[in-house]
Each structure stands twice: as structure tokens, then as C-alpha cells.
Amino acid sequence: MPCIQAQYGTPAPSPGPRDHLAGDLLTPELSKPTMDLASPEAAPAVPTALPSFSTFMDGYTGEFDTFLYQLSGTAQPCSSASSSASSTSSSSATSPASASFKFEDFQVYGCYPGTLSGPLDETLSSSGSDYYGSPCSAPSPSTPSFQPPQLSPWDGSFGPFSPSQTYEGLRAWTEQLPKASGPPQPPAFFSFSPPPGPSPSLAPSPLKLFPSQAAHQLGEGESYSMQTAFPGLVPTSPHLDGSGRLDAPVTSAKARSGAPGGSEGRCAVCGDNASCQHYGVRTCEGCKGFFKRTVQKNAKYICLANKDCPVDKRRRNRCQFCRFQKCLAVGMVKEVVRTDSLKGRRGRLPSKPKQPPETSPAHLLTSLVRAHLDSGPSTSKLDYSKFQELALPHFGKEDAGDVQQFYDLLSGSLEVIRKWAEKIPGFAELSPGDQDLLLESAFLELFILRLAYRSKPAEGKLIFCSGLVLHRLQCARGFGDWIDSILAFSRSLHSLVVDIPAFACLSALVLITDRHGLQEPRRVEELQNRIASCLKEHVSAEAGEPQPASCLSRLLGKLPELRTLCTQGLQRIFYLKLEDLVPPPPIVDKIFMDTLPF
């Protein structure tokens, strides 16, 4: 162990009673022998300016490494650690007033006053003893590969007047400090001060040493320094009291600098690092993405526990229900999250789509009327070539000609109805499968409705879509009793005095309705609602009655009657198939097979 001797001359004796204690050899149990303070030999016994060992002992209960400490009245330096033992023995023999002091389990490197070196000398030095101009220049442990960071003067261990951070002996010393077991008391290890008299080799030191008894744990982002290891080590200033202690507690550099590690930089949901606010609350990127996905997908979570699962950085992914509930509890706003239709449109809200003119009720009504007029024969081009008003009915079984006429009238009407349907706004946008399904399902109903509206039941005239005019008796053998039901429906329909726009809307509603097997029933329903609204507005404007709803209800009441007449038509086709006089056309046969209710 290095030998430490005073390098000053004999100063004036200190008047304090502790400075006059004899340097007796202490036992390993750290007990001091009693002595008479009034003895005249005690005054010049220790004429050195080094701190008394009672200062070391007060407040410290740890173990000390054993080494010899020689107090000498002369100022002869010892040059190496190997000459310490011989110097101690010779000094004991020549100076009876001085005594050797032995400590157990305690090591001190460079913690004694001496000449302070500048920052350049401190960098070039390799031992802790050189920094203070110690007479004993024994090298201290160091780590050559470690490069100390460039810190400010007060961010180092002891500032520019302290050993470098490569000094590992200091860390070993701090690890041997005892744990505080009781109420914290102000520690007082040793306080360095210059000798009473001015010394040319010692400059006033601005440092006070108050090592903490509790180990200081470094926070995230902090570097190891004496300020963090020993918070009590603070520079003395005129603002401090005589003891060199601060009146207020010393805060760490992390709290003073407002680092992101503070509470304002933490996620309000899980406590992770958060750089900015998301959806109204400071949150991390993980909680922001979780909240966004949950709102956009409208996800529903279930808690497998008691809905009070802990949500922190480590356990935030365990329960999605509790995590989302905490997001709402801390104030995250769901309405701020953009929906799928707004992705990629920052700073813009969707403008209200302007209703195109072709989808307006007036334009829809005009299109329906035009489609109806184009699909029907004009009154100036009716074909009366086969009309026989006075023809006698042929009672008995129908022949092949009557059955073939029946099939031809049905097949011709199907092509006209198909062309009419293609002119209805919105029908062409439906899928081809839905178009065929709607046409085949509503064909017989449309055939009956259109025939009944064009015909003149009072005169017994039946006007078909091709312009052919036949008398009721001419159709009796082919249509059977079904023709009489059609004429009865025609009379009831004409009694309502239905104009062309209302009839065009009613015909479209017969086609555009819900059918079993539709691929896009939603689109069919939307188109049906538009046509129904158009019909309602027209009837309300043209009826001229106090209660226009009654006229609309009577008009819509004809739709169930059409279903009944459609069933009678299927029965007639089935009967003709059983007679097997003429094979039905493929399109009629397909319609029959697809629309059978059984």
C-alpha cells in the first residue's frame, strides 16, 4: 500500500481538541485508547494539517483495509510504496511522539490535499496520486482501452480537479459502502480544507465531499459520473452554508434538463416513450396504430379476465379489450380516425356528391315514360288484319293453330319487354344474372299488365304489343278462361284512370322487385325505392285529392292481383304441355320451368 506523509511544514497548532489527539495505533475493532487531552505532550504530537481520523470514523461502520499511516513532523516525502514500510519503522524509532495508525479493509487513492493540476496535466497523468501532487506516485489501476467521454467540468467524477473516469478503485470503494438501515442521516466522511496558514503548494479547493450511503442507480440516458454516484459531491459557492450543503435537495440532471424520460414524454396508455400526440392524447406509435386499426375495422374484443387487466409496456398486448378501454379512458377520440374511404386524403373532407341529373326524380320519370311509349304500338299503326268481331266461338277442344297462336303471342311479347327493360335507368347496371332473373320472373305479370292497359274491355278488343288486335272470342280457345280474367283486370285498372307516367312507374315496380336468388339484392332494392318515390311524388302532384295516399294505395293494390293472374297463366301453359299438340318454344318452356312455385 502507498505510504502517505504530510508534505507541508509544521503549521501552527490547531486550537481544536480533535487536532491534539495522539496518533495511537487503532485496533481492528476501530477502538481508540483513552488519553489525557490536558497532557502537555499531546499538543505537538500531531502537527500536520491532514484530516483527523476521527472524522473518518464518525458515521462509518464499514470495514477498512489494513495499511500503515505515518504521521511525521518532518516534511520528508517517500518516493515509492516499497519505501513505505522502512519509513514507517524508522519514523517509529526516531519519533516517539508520532505513532503509526493501522486501518482494516480501507483503501484511499489520491484523496489527500496537494498541488492541483490543470486539465492538460490531468489528461496526461496515469495515476490518481499525480493529480494532487502527491509525494507518493504509485500508479493506480486503470483501463487503457477505455476512452472517457468529453464532458463539461462538472459532469465528470470530480470535475477538472479529480481523477479520470478510468479509475476503477473508486468504483470498488463505492461497492463496499454499507446499506442504510434506518432513518437516513447526513453522512460525513471527510471534508477537505486548506491548512490554516497559506501554503504555496496548495490552492483553495472548491470541492466538498459527501458520499451517499445508498447506491445510486443510473437512469436511462445518464452517464456514470461522480455526480450520479455521489450526489453529495457539489461545488462550494457563496450560496451554500458553512458546511457546504445545499438547502434544497439536489435534483438529477435528467430531471433538470426535462429529458423525454419524464412523465410528459410517456405514453398515456402503456407508459412507453411517446414523441407527440395522437388522436388527442400523447401516445406511443404502438398504441396509436392499435387504436386506429380498432376504430377502422370496428373490431370487438372480449376480456377473458375481470376487465381490469394491467396495460403497460410489457403486457399491453395481452388483453386487447382492456387496452382499447384504456385508450378511451385517457381521452383518445374515435371520431378523429379516418375511415377507409378517406385514406390518403389528408386535409380534405369528402364533398357531398352532387346528384347527377339522370338520377333525379323528374329525369327518372321522363325516362320511364319514354321507355313505355317506345315499347308499345302507336294507335295509328294497329293491325286489324286478323280482327273478327262477329266470329263464332268454336266450342270443344282447341286445335294446334290456337295453341301455336298462343305461344307466338307470348314469345313476341317477351322480346318487346326485354327491350323496354333495358331502357329503364339503373337496370342495365345490374349484373346479367340479376337482369335475366328479374325478366323471367316478371314476364307473365308484365304481359298481363301491359295487355290489360292497352286493351279495350268494353269493346272486347285485345291489343297486343306487336300491334295485333284480336277479339276476345278469337283468343278463347288458345287462352281458355285466362282471357276472361285478364279482361276483368283490365276493367278494374281503367276504372282508376291511371295516366301514362303512373303506369310507367307501376310497370317498372313489377320488374324491379325482390326475387329469390338475386346476386345484388341491395342494388335492386335501392332502384326499387327510387322508382317508388318517383311514383309517390307524381301521384301526390297529379291526383288533386285531399288524400293522395289513398290513390297510391289503390294503384299499388293491383300488384297482388297480378300475382294471382300469373299463377293462372302458368296453369294454362302446364295444361297445353300436357295436351302436347304443339311443343312450346324453348324460351317459354324455360320461363315455365323456372317460375313454377313447386
From Swiss-Prot:
Q: Which UniProt keywords apply?
A: Acetylation, Cytoplasm, DNA-binding, Inflammatory response, Metal-binding, Mitochondrion, Nucleus, Phosphoprotein, Receptor, Transcription, Transcription regulation, Zinc, Zinc-finger
Which parts of the sequence are annotated with region: AF-2? 584-595
Binds lipopolysaccharide: region residues: 521-544
- In residue numbers, the region (Required for the interaction with RXRA) covers 299-361
Q: Which domain of life is it from?
A: Eukaryota
| Entry's localization field | Nucleus; Cytoplasm, Cytosol; Mitochondrion
**DNA-binding region(s) in UniProt:** 264-339
Q: How is the cofactor bound?
A: Binds 2 zinc ions.
Q: Does the keyword Cell wall biogenesis/degradation apply?
A: no
Q: PANTHER family, alphabetically?
A: NUCLEAR HORMONE RECEPTOR, NUCLEAR RECEPTOR SUBFAMILY 4 GROUP A MEMBER 1
Instruction: Relate the assembly described in the record.
Output: Binds the NGFI-B response element (NBRE) as a monomer. Binds the Nur response element (NurRE), consisting of two inverse NBRE-related octanucleotide repeats separated by 6 base-pairs, as a dimer. Interacts (via N-terminus) with NLRP3 (via LRR repeat domain); the interaction is direct, requires binding of NR4A1/Nur77 to NBRE-containing dsDNA and lipopolysaccharide, and leads to non-canonical NLRP3 inflammasome activation. Interacts with GADD45GIP1. Interacts with STK11. Interacts with IFI27.
Give the protein's recorded name: Nuclear receptor subfamily 4 group A member 1
Q: Which organism is it from?
A: Bos taurus
Please name the taxonomic classification of the source: Eukaryota, Metazoa, Chordata, Craniata, Vertebrata
Gene encoding this polypeptide? NR4A1
